[in-house]
């Protein structure tokens, strides 16, 4: 299968490319950044998805059988400070991709990656959350993901594009950048252990619970969704278990050799937060048989070890 992966230079994109190649797929990546051009054994096109003519050239040159659309501004916090950029980037790039496929008369299967944040302020009776729960987004990022989700359905319904939509819950692992909760804590703790910052871990609201899946399991689910999913349908992907952020913090601290004080930073508290997210994945599991394979403690350890090594390298470079 010839697969086109947008956002190939991102955290999930790199894991997905590795998995697709293991499955024997021929992969072409797309990235706005030149930094992704050096990916081993993967041709990468530096293409701005907001440029329709560039996207048209891309699909004509690659003629994919499968499209994994991962490219997006993916930080909810960043979307609050830059709603214009988030919504324009996330919607226009996908719109251009669909229009380019129609213009080229190509008919690949397309995976549109939404987010559990689409569900937003979930009612207590809707946890665990299934695909029929109402969408009540509370950040510009979440609004953009609802837009991508609905656009995917519209192009399926109106134009017959073989779109499969997924709503992944939180996913993390080694290589995840420090804008996000687990890698942010892991980096801070690694810096404390290395003597590069005061022994204080700055945190936001620790009394919320999130459903975490290892990214290496998530990308397996993405390929299964694209290959086995029903065009026009939508699937939740997650572990089906929620973890308190306070528990995550304590387990990360236990992995390091330093004393760490936990301190709430008011700047990290959100005006509105979702108390608990937990996926009901029965629909996707019944279709594909997918289950997470990597235990929570392994994801936690691997993420911390990634940042421990990265911090060591940074310390060496600075000395």
Model-derived features: positions:
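N-terminal Rossmann NAD(P)H-binding glycine-rich loop of SDR-like oxidoreductase domains
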Residues: 3-22
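Rossmann-fold cofactor-recognition segment
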Residues: 41-51
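NAD(P)H-binding glycine-rich loop region in Rossmannoid oxidoreductase-like domains
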Residues: 49-89
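Catalytic helix-loop patch of NAD(P)-dependent Rossmann-fold dehydrogenases
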Residues: 81-99, 103, 109, 117-165
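NAD(P)-dependent short-chain dehydrogenase/reductase
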Residues: 122-128, 150-211, 215-223, 240-242, ...
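Mid/C-terminal beta-alpha module of Rossmann-like enzyme folds, strongest
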Residues: 184-185, 228-269, 314
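Conserved C-terminal active-site "lid" loop/helix of NAD(P)H-dependent oxidoreductases
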Residues: 215, 234, 247, 266-291, ...
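Amphipathic terminal alpha-helices
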Residues: 296-319
């Amino acid at each position: 299968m010839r697969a086109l992966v947008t956002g190939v230079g991102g955290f999930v994109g790199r894991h997905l490319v590795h998995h697709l190649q293991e499955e024997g797929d021929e992969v072409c990546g797309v990235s706005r950044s030149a930094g992704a051009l050096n990916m081993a054994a993967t041709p990468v096109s530096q293409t701005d998805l907001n440029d329709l003519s560039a996207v048209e050239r891309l699909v004509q040159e690659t003629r994919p059988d499968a499209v994994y659309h991962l490219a997006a501004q993916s930080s909810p916090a960043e979307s609050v400070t830059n709603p214009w950029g988030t919504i324009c980037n996330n919607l226009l790039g996908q719109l251009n991709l669909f229009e380019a496929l129609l213009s080229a008369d190509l008919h690949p299967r397309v995976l549109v990656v939404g987010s559990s944040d689409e569900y937003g302020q979930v009612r207590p009776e809707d946890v665990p959350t299934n695909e029929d729960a109402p969408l009540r987004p509370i950040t510009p990022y979440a609004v953009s993901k609802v837009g991508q989700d609905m656009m995917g359905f519209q192009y399926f319904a109106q134009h017959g594009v073989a779109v499969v939509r997924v709503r992944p819950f939180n996913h993390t692992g080694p290589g995840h950048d420090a804008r996000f909760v687990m890698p942010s804590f892991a980096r801070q703790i690694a810096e404390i252990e290395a003597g590069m910052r005061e022994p204080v871990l700055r945190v936001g609201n620790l009394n919320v619970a999130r459903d975490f899946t290892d990214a290496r399991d998530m990308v397996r689910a993405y390929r299964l969704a694209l290959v086995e999913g029903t065009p026009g349908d939508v699937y939740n992907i997650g572990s089906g278990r929620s973890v308190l952020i306070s528990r995550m913090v304590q387990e990360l601290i236990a992995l390091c050799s330093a004393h760490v004080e936990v301190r709430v930073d008011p700047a990290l508290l959100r005006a509105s937060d979702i108390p608990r997210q937990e996926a009901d994945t029965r629909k996707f599991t019944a279709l594909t048989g997918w289950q997470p394979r990597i235990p929570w403690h392994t994801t936690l350890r691997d993420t911390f070890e990634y940042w421990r090594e990265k911090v060591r390298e940074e310390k060496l470079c600075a000395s």
